[in-house]
């Protein structure tokens, strides 16, 4: 089980019926920036055999910031009865946000390729303060720079957030290319390589 001295700083609040791939990308990139133990993502962070409901609410309490990740289906997702999940008092997304408010956590709405911020009149009364919180948008065509911008802002806002400037993916490496021309060596910029890379003479 997780120790009392948890490293969790960022809690990802998201709806599984919404943009699951988007939130997985967000977790991957923020984990690369700050370390995987720093970011709580339920499908990654809850240990086998753990009480998953207690684990989620404990993680909200331990975190410094709760990112409310909103895709295009976040607000309109419905349950088996055809009612909006966000209106259900037992909805976990709703309960996590309300707990974050109750505990005075920094709550940051993150829009995944959603052009407009959520409106107060579209939210249940208990969550309407989400509409006045400063949010950040992650665009489909600008996801990389947008997530980098989010990470930079989080680093400014959250005390003690670990800094990890380089990607940690085992499948990514860097090399520096040199060219020899007339005895002169020219050094080029670093390049990230995914998969196998062979450096050597070319034979036909």
Regions picked out by a protein language model, each given a short descriptive name:
Residues 51, 72-105, 115-117:
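Conserved TIR/SEFIR loop-to-helix hotspot centered on a Trp-containing motif
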Residues 23-25, 78-82, 121-123:
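Short amphipathic alpha-helical segments
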Residues 116-127:
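Glycine-rich, charge-decorated loop segments at or immediately adjacent to ligand/cofactor-binding or catalytic sites
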Residues 164-204:
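Long, low-complexity intrinsically disordered regions enriched in small/polar
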Residues 139-158:
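C-terminal helix of von Willebrand factor
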């Amino acid at each position: 089980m997780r120790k009392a001295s948890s490293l969790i700083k960022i809690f990802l609040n998201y709806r599984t019926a919404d943009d699951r791939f988007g939130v997985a990308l967000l977790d991957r990139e923020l984990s690369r920036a700050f370390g995987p133990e720093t970011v709580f993502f339920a499908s990654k962070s809850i240990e086998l055999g753990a009480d998953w409901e207690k684990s989620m609410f404990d993680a909200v309490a331990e975190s410094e910031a709760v990112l409310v990740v909103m895709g295009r289906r976040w607000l309109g997702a419905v349950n088996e009865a055809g009612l909006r999940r966000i209106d259900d008092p037992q909805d976990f997304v709703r309960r996590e946000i309300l707990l974050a408010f109750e505990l005075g956590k920094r709550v940051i709405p993150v829009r995944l390729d959603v052009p407009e911020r959520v409106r107060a009149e579209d939210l249940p009364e208990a969550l309407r303060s989400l509409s006045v919180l400063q949010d950040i948008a992650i665009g489909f065509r600008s996801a990389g720079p947008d997530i980098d911008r989010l990470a930079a802002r989080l680093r400014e806002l959250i005390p003690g957030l670990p800094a990890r400037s380089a990607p940690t993916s085992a499948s990514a490496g860097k090399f520096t290319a040199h060219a020899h021309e007339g005895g002169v060596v020219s050094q080029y910029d670093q390049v990230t390589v995914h998969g196998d890379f062979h450096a050597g003479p070319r034979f036909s």
